[in-house]
Regions:
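Catalytic cores and motor modules of nucleic-acid processing enzymes
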Residues: 1-171
């Protein structure tokens, strides 16, 4: 149980779009705690196995997309709730990779960048400008780009600490 919980928390920490895994895990554990008969235990175990297999699918999806965990997190934020054609999906992948590379070159390396208003504004503006200039229209409208800008910025704020450190390691 502790191993799975640790793996789920790590996954959610690295990519907030995987929070559904954690919710499903909690539901399974609650279900287990409600009943202790053999049928409930077997069903709970089956669901736990299914959940662990879905972790593997998420990891395989990351590899299949040709992205790192940190790139996939941005990619997932940008594509969440969208039905994208392959061409658009590839554009979103490219945007995710290039935006992250650009920010990691300088802005995210500033110690405690999120606490410094000028640097934080520069990060936000880079995200906003990049998304407004590159996300495919009409698939992404102005209000959606505003939302995605805020989601990406919040993700960066919580995952990148500055000084070349992030939840993904040193960069």
């Amino acid at each position: 149980k502790k191993k799975e919980e640790k793996q789920i928390k790590k996954m959610v920490e690295r990519n907030p779009m995987t929070v559904d895994f954690y919710k499903r895990y909690q539901e399974i554990i609650e279900e287990y705690n409600r009943g202790k008969d053999e049928a409930v235990i077997k069903e709970t175990f089956r669901k736990l196995i299914e959940l662990v297999n879905s972790f593997s699918e998420e990891e395989a999806d990351t590899r299949r997309e040709g992205l790192t965990d940190e790139q996939k997190a941005i990619f997932d934020i940008l594509r969440h709730g969208k039905k994208l054609e392959d061409k658009e999906k590839n554009e979103i992948k490219k945007i995710s990779v290039e935006l992250l590379e650009d920010l990691k070159q300088e802005k995210l390396k500033v110690d405690q960048w999120a606490d410094k208003s000028v640097t934080a504004a520069a990060v936000f503006n880079t995200v906003s400008k990049t998304l407004f200039e590159t996300l495919p229209y009409p698939s992404y409208q102005t209000d959606e780009i505003d939302l995605k800008t805020n989601l990406v910025y919040e993700h960066l704020k919580h995952q990148y600490f500055g000084g070349g450190m992030s939840v993904y390691g040193q960069y």
